[in-house]
């Protein structure tokens, strides 16, 4: 009579157990000790049923099947089998003849022979295989030692059927334990044999199925439940679980395997077995359900007065950032990015930098191509952009100042990946929206441009009013805020945004990088090599970029509100709706930015065009145009898909909306870092070197407003901090500022590339007569006082404020 492998080795899903050994290999050869094995229904030696459909000498695990036809379910014994009087009589007769229970088992299973594939060496092979089998899990030594004696007792009721040799077995228990451990291997060392297994069975009555944990019995695993009738309920096995995981791993990225195809696939989102978004950095919330997330996007109706949209139950009270993020479709951006795709994306970013020849990439540890030593910041010849030697040095300096500091943090933190960066950006968006909605910026005076922007009514955005969303404080967040807005240089992060969005990010950051490089070739601690027209263009670009950043912040506020709320009666929706209709005609769909361009650049047309134009001025303006074009594209993309998302509630469209918001946040952070650098350069050139320049009076009010609202996204750097960072980087790169022009052998120059199409097609519209959004032109020394707390150190500000009092 053969017995099924399920009872001998447990459930077939336990993949660490062997299925093909004979039961005799698990029994001690010292039968004279007359030790018995537990006859519980859960022990393998107690089942007398037919053989399974598999060969005992077949060591292939994949041949197991879990259908009801293979004997695993039908051969499970019930209580009647163990109450069979004939079996009891046979057992008594075996004992009365002086044979032990182990000898009885040998007689019972004598006729069972495995297939003859291995010939006479079958038993020896089985013994070797049994000694190699490992336990699936181990107990603590104390727990194993505490319940080892349980296997030495019979589990019949009242002990009336205990044999005469039972007491002797208990006396010789210690000796038998040493023998069994030496002959069959100690269970403490991980060897899985019958002695170690049966020693874990707890003392129990005949019909009791209680065990000391899920691994103590044979088939009483945590994955299988035994019914009172003796039948088993089998859920999905480990084999099928492995297959599911394998299939999900191979298809999780779907279309992302190709570095060219980055389209958002709806099929990828159907992999519901993946962890939720916030499980990467926080404990999953019990509030989240798939049905509740869909309620958030349902369309609501109301009267023209403006009613609060219907919210899911979890949004009606104070919530955490994890609960909010779970209801924003972004799983597509949290998937891993292949290294080959990221390397290709990094190469595309620096293809436009042909002027600098070799450029160090994100995954490269080598320095860029530049000359050590003196760095000359004198003005180049007429119509030239910069000295080539100085431009290469400035390129290495700017990249090490921002990008390389972030890269070193990413490489040093193993748990840091682009998924953490996406969650950081989304958390920053939520903090920005809450800060705008709650404070309304009255604390920072009357910023005129804010008066033209709509505000969500109180009660229409409870998520912004009642949420307790905290700013992320982990090492990754600190590194992202303190690297001059360099998250845009991270190739994996750009790939996670999608094919169209990463192209937009590349276009913006390349233009800003070139402007920073060529500006650094003209300003140093020793001299400023910029004429008056170039300083005026720099001042105008700072003003226009502050206006663009304020509009971008407002876009994040309104877009997040529209993703979380589907009401169309609010003023915010009207603003976004009209923005989509005019975004192709207006920069960032804003008349304020249109008039700001006319006011700032209208008086500088002669410095931009014609023979008197300056290449450096055009480079600075091109950086601004590229940034505002990127924002304009993202605003149009968001609004063109938002109507369809509200109507169809399509997950694919929802992920596109979220990707547009995250991309705008990436560009905004890079713009804030760019503003920080060029403002520091202008202050060094104007205040420290006494170069007078006029600035619009509202410029630094907007900059202070941005510094406060976006403090969760970017940490502004003061002038003193910037100078210290720059000097430390130059010392690391073995560079030093020098006066005069480069020597004759190093005096090659860089000329401007082909003129920008955007700059050539730029049409300036003069503002109306009563237009007062930008204020008046004032000297830089006076305008900078509005943001002195952000630009200068606190000690310097306090000292400057005490000086007028001492003079009086």
Curated annotation (Swiss-Prot):
Q: How this protein is processed and modified after translation, per its record?
A: Phosphorylated by US3. This phosphorylation is required for proper nuclear localization.
The knockout note for this entry states:
Deletion mutants are unable to be horizontally transmitted to naive chickens contrary to the wild-type virus while skin tropism remains unaffected. Mutants show also an increase of unspliced glycoprotein/gC transcripts.
CC annotations in GO = host cell cytoplasm; host cell nucleus; viral tegument
Q: Enumerate the Gene Ontology biological process terms.
A: regulation of DNA-templated transcription
The record's region (Disordered) falls at 1-21, 77-266
**Signal peptide extent:** none
Q: Which InterPro entries match?
A: Herpes_UL47
Notes concerning its domains: The nuclear export signal is CRM1-dependent.
State the name under which the record lists this protein: Tegument protein UL47 homolog
């Amino acid at each position: 009579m053969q017995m099924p492998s399920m009872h001998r080795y447990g459930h077939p899903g336990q993949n660490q157990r062997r299925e093909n050994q004979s039961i005799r290999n698990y029994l001690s050869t010292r039968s004279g000790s007359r030790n018995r094995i537990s006859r519980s229904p859960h022990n393998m030696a107690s089942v007398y049923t037919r053989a399974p459909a598999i060969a005992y000498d077949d060591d292939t695990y994949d041949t197991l099947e879990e259908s009801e036809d293979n004997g695993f379910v039908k051969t499970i014994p019930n209580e009647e089998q163990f109450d069979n009087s004939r079996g009891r009589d046979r057992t008594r007769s075996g004992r009365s003849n002086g044979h032990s229970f182990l000898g009885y088992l040998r007689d019972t299973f004598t006729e069972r022979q495995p297939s003859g594939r291995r010939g006479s060496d079958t038993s020896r092979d089985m013994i070797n295989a049994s000694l190699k089998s490992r336990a699936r899990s181990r107990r603590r030594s104390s727990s194993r030692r505490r319940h080892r004696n349980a296997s030495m007792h019979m589990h019949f009721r009242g002990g009336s059927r205990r044999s005469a040799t039972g007491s002797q077995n208990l006396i010789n228990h210690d000796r038998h334990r040493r023998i069994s451990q030496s002959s069959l291997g100690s269970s403490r060392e991980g060897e899985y044999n019958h002695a170690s297994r049966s020693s874990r069975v707890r003392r129990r009555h005949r019909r009791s199925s209680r065990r000391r944990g899920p691994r103590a019995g044979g088939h009483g695993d945590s994955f299988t439940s035994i019914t009172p009738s003796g039948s088993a309920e089998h859920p999905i096995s480990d084999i099928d679980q492995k297959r599911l995981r394998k299939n999900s791993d191979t298809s999780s990225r779907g279309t992302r395997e190709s570095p060219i195809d980055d389209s958002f696939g709806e099929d990828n989102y159907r992999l519901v077995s993946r962890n939720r978004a916030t499980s990467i950095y926080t404990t999953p919330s019990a509030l989240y359900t798939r049905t509740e997330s869909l309620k958030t996007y349902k369309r609501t109706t109301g009267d023209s007065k403006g009613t609060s949209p219907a919210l899911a139950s979890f949004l009606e009270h104070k919530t955490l950032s994890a609960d909010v993020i779970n209801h924003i479709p972004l799983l597509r951006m949290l998937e891993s990015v292949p290294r080959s795709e990221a390397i290709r994306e990094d190469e595309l970013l620096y293809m436009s930098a042909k002027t600098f020849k070799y450029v160090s990439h994100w995954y490269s540890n080598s320095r860029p191509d530049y000359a050590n030593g003196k760095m000359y910041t004198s003005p180049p010849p007429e119509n030239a952009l910069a000295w080539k030697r100085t431009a290469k040095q400035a390129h290495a300096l700017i990249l090490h100042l921002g990008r390389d500091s972030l890269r070193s943090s990413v490489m040093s933190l193993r748990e840091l990946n682009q998924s953490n960066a996406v969650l950081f950006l989304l958390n920053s968006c939520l903090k920005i929206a809450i800060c705008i909605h709650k404070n309304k910026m009255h604390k920072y005076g009357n910023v005129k441009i804010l008066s033209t922007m709509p505000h969500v009514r109180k009660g229409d955005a409870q998520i912004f009013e009642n949420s307790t969303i905290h700013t992320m404080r982990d090492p990754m967040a600190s590194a992202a805020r303190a690297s001059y807005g360099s998250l845009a240089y991270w190739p994996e992060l750009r790939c996670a945004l999608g094919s169209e969005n990463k192209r937009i990010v590349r276009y913006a950051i390349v233009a800003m990088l070139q402007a920073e490089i060529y500006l650094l070739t003209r300003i140093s601690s020793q001299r400023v090599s910029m004429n008056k027209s170039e300083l005026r263009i720099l001042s105008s670009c700072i003003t226009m970029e502050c206006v663009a950043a304020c509009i971008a912040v407002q876009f994040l506020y309104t877009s997040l509100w529209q993703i979380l709320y589907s009401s169309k009666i609010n003023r915010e929706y009207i603003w976004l709706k009209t923005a989509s209709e005019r975004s192709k005609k207006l920069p960032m769909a804003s008349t304020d930015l249109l008039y700001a361009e006319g006011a700032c650049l209208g008086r500088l047309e002669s410095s931009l065009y014609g023979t008197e134009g300056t290449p450096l001025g055009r480079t600075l303006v091109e950086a601004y145009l590229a940034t505002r074009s990127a924002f304009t594209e993202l605003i149009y993309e968001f609004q063109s898909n938002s109507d369809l998302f509200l109507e169809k509630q399509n997950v694919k469209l929802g992920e596109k909306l979220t990707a547009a918001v995250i991309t705008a946040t990436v560009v905004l952070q890079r713009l804030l870092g760019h503003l920080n650098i060029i403002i520091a350069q202008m202050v060094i050139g104007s205040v420290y070197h006494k170069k007078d320049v006029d600035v619009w009076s509202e410029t630094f009010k907007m900059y202070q407003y941005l510094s406060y609202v976006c403090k969760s996204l970017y940490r502004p750097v003061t002038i003193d901090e910037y100078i210290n960072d720059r000097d430390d980087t130059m010392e690391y790169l073995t560079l030093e500022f020098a006066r005069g022009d480069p020597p004759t052998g190093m005096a090659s120059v860089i000329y401007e590339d082909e003129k920008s199409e955007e700059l050539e097609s730029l049409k300036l519209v003069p503002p109306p007569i009563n237009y007062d959004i930008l204020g008046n032109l004032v000297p830089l020394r006076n305008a900078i006082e509005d943001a002195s707390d952000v630009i200068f150190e606190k000690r310097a500000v306090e000292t400057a404020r005490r000086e007028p009092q001492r003079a009086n």
